[in-house]
């Protein structure tokens, strides 16, 4: 998945940012050097950190569920990251609106953080390879989370079903010979997915709350078209995600969501 753009398909996110636009105009004076964070985002961050600190100790899945739940209702916003092959990358913290991938970024960084400074530092490790805030080292694809070292997640897709399918991709390549993201190379990668019609009760039982589900892309230049989190909710499994169609972060019944996509790629966070 390239970071989110809506023109490639009718899903909420497609994971590619072809253009990157600035977020809100007002940037906090308290922001650390090199960090772009609005006053509203700074306030949201402090509130979230306080809520997490007050939450009872929980296992990894419950911790992920709690943190991801803090974003429910947050407005959807595309193109919040800043940087391209021709524009310097900025370390953006935008918690007042999120797309499918920035939502995942912020949840993962919050899971690792007890303070504002820790969050800002951990977000660099989540979003960028080698801790280098640059367009070239941004993790543009969903499967970068498992393919980059140190890995943020393990790709568990193949172990979920005997019907899992492996396919060879050339990430970032277009059918016309161009690339989705100018200035970045084409990345050969094997992507494994479970076709939606094969995601039965047995497969769902092997998913864990906090797993990230990517909607498999038929396009050979993309790995997935949308990303969200699996939650084993009391009323049934849901897909928690930032939806452009609904305009906010929502829970969608997993069975309903599976009916709209070709298959799932599943990454299990290492923490």
Label for each model-derived stretch:
Residues 33-184:
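N-terminal capping segments
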Residues 170-217:
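A mid-sequence, solvent-exposed acidic-amphipathic segment
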Residues 86-90, 103, 195-200, 215-217, ...:
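N-terminal post-signal-peptidase region of extra-cytosolic proteins
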Residues 92-96, 205, 219:
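Short, contiguous, pocket-lining structural segments
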Residues 213-270:
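C-terminal soluble interaction/assembly domains
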Residues 99, 208, 223:
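Short, well-structured alpha-helical interface segments that form or flank functional binding sites
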Residues 112-116, 206, 233-236:
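Secondary-structure boundary elements
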Residues 3-31:
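Secretory targeting and sorting signals
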């Amino acid at each position: 998945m390239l970071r989110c753009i809506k023109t490639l398909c009718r899903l909420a996110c497609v994971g590619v940012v072809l253009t990157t636009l600035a977020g809100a105009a007002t940037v906090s004076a308290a922001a650390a050097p090199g960090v772009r964070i609005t006053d509203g985002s700074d306030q949201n961050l402090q509130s979230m950190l306080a809520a997490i600190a007050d939450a009872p100790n929980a296992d990894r899945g419950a911790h992920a569920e709690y943190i991801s739940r803090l974003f429910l209702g947050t407005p959807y916003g595309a193109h919040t990251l800043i940087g391209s092959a021709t524009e310097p990358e900025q370390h953006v913290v935008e918690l007042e609106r999120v797309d499918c991938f920035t939502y995942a970024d912020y949840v993962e960084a919050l899971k690792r953080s007890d303070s504002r400074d820790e969050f800002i530092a951990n977000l660099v490790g989540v979003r960028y390879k080698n801790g280098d805030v640059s367009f070239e080292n941004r993790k543009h694809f969903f499967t970068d989370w498992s393919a980059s070292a140190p890995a943020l997640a393990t790709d568990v897709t193949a172990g979920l079903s005997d019907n899992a399918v492996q396919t060879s991709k050339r990430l970032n390549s277009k059918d016309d010979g161009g690339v989705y993201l100018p200035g970045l190379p084409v990345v050969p990668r094997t992507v494994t997915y479970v076709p939606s019609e094969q995601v039965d009760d047995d497969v769902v039982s092997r998913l864990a709350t906090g797993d990230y589900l990517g909607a498999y892309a038929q396009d050979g230049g993309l790995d997935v078209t949308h990303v969200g989190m699996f939650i084993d909710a009391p009323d049934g499994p849901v897909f928690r995600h930032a939806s452009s169609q609904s305009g906010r972060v929502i829970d969608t019944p997993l069975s309903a969501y599976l009916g709209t996509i070709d298959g799932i790629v599943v990454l299990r966070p290492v923490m």
